[in-house]
């Protein structure tokens, strides 16, 4: 979606290249996985699976302590790969967390959700997004679900990726575009 692209571009164009990379990578990862913010920030290296030297999937402990495996989209793969490459170049301490501070007295500790929330609002404002003050990391989860549906994925697939117990919950997340609704209506065969 164009709003997500603008958000990611604004995140990357930070006065501090290090901070820009971090903000871009984390927001792209959240959008590219559909994870809840708590799920993403609690991920450790032990939760990560590689394929051909590239991050491939993450093991997530979701609501109700239900475990699921989320295969990374190309967007999430690129974002995580770039972030981990940066952390290794910076000589990051052996923090088990994928998304942790790389400097200062918080070095090695995972980012708090409120820090990510504040960063997202700053970036959204810089991107010129309307309603930037109401944007939350959870909205990226909604965008992920809607984008998958727009791409023709079934609601059962989206339900599993989001870790929902019920399709009714997934339906709340899915915002079908007018174009898709028109295509659906035209798909009905004519009878006369």
Where are these regions (language model features)?
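Conserved catalytic core of the tyrosine transesterase superfamily
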Residues: 1-192
């Amino acid at each position: 979606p164009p709003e997500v692209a603008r958000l990611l571009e604004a995140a990357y164009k930070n006065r501090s290249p290090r901070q820009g990379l971090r903000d871009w990578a984390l927001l792209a990862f959240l959008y590219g996985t559909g994870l809840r913010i708590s799920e993403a920030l609690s991920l450790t290296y032990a939760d990560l699976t590689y394929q051909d030297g590239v991050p491939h999937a993450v093991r997530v402990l979701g609501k109700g302590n239900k475990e699921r495996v989320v295969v990374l989209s190309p967007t999430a793969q690129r974002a995580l790969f770039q972030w981990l490459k940066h952390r290794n170049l910076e000589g990051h301490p052996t923090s088990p967390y994928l998304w942790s501070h790389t400097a200062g007295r918080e070095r090695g500790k995972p980012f708090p959700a409120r820090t990510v929330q504040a960063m997202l609002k700053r970036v959204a404002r810089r991107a010129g997004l309307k309603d930037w003050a109401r944007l939350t990391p959870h909205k990226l989860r909604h965008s992920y679900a809607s984008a998958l549906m727009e791409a023709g994925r079934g609601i059962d697939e989206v339900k599993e990726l989001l870790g929902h117990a019920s399709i009714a919950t997934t339906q709340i997340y899915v915002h079908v575009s007018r174009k898709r609704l028109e295509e659906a209506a035209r798909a009905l065969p004519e009878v006369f």
